[in-house]
Amino acid sequence: HGNDTRDWCLYDFNGHTSHMAHGALLETLRIAATGEGLVASWALRPGSPDTAPVFDVRLEARPGLAPDPLLPFIESRVVQRRAMRTTPLTPAQRAALAAAPGPGYTAQFFESSAERKAVAGFLWRSAYVRLICPEAYPVHKEIIEWRTRFSKDRIPEQAVGVDAATARLMEWVMASWGRVKFFNTYLGGTIAPRIQLDYLPARACAAHVLIRADVPAEGVEAHVRGGVALQRVWL
């Protein structure tokens, strides 16, 4: 049983972000099932609402089934929002990433210094809108759990991607929209988080990968399958 957050989350346009998250979960389930010798398949239950889609999952024993190659990475893969090495992708790495989303999707790579700089500039500008938007403030306040490394249902502070000093300042400022607006207007409050969360990681990496559907996604199931493809690339 799924649900979406469009009623309170600015980023969940028409619930499609949540639908993609459902796809990521279903693909993780499918991969994990192979470790138990099971084939997992799913179908969107007809008539279930877009805001609360229901997925029927079927598990079938398959003796001799080989574990999915992505199985070991379910528990080890983590979000990394800090600067990384700029070592270019090898042909094998690029080929693996290109094949990961499966049929119906194309991977586009932005690898050169100029391309990464362009992406960084785009993220720098879009982050400004994100950080000054009053409608986004309640979302940011809700989803971060401060002073922790792990969280059951939110983004833990150590996964946000800022240094300790910036984290303490952000925690205090984000206690009220009035503080956020004052800092953004008069004290350059967007600069430090944009540098640390957007610009530097965008420049200091091997590549950016854009996953494009060969056919524009329409409806819940198409976005769920987009989440399946994205999860395979991420793992």
Regions found by a protein language model. Name each.
Residues H1-L235:
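Acidic, surface-exposed loops and disordered segments
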